[in-house]
């Protein structure tokens, strides 16, 4: 049942649509994604999509299961915002944010936190106002195309402490970054069509992790 997927989409009108079911979602333009990928088993989700002018805006809500915990009653939830803006015919920029929190612990049954149903970017002020221990991440997605070539990249910030970075370097647990750089192209030679893709991905130590393991940005 872990690999079973079922997805549905309902278009309300030209500006609004909804997707829901059990599946996966991919954010990005490359082979992999440092923001949200499909490299895991399906999970329950609901996505509300708003489209207008040059903008696509996604509200994405999920239920995850911890990769190291075999007890499927131990759930965690995710709330995501992703804003995709087409600057022009060549350049698209996306802003990403996510909050991961555990459904319960030994003392408290929290469930899905309705504070994160806020449809407006940003989550960070909500988390701060609640004095929340949740796992917060932000990111950037860029795609630039010209002729038959696409240049793309991503940056994910899980945690960043500039003052400590100079003294402690990559291994400091409060400097958690991931990035992606890539290029892809389609071209023809003597009527034969070719696809080319080259991509580099890197994540700093402890990126996606959290001091409370159930709040790691992972799914089984």
Regions found by a protein language model. Name each.
Residues 1-57:
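Well-ordered mid-protein domain cores that form the structural environment of catalytic cofactors
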Residues 15-17, 26, 45-220:
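Signature for the C-terminal beta-barrel architecture of outer-membrane proteins
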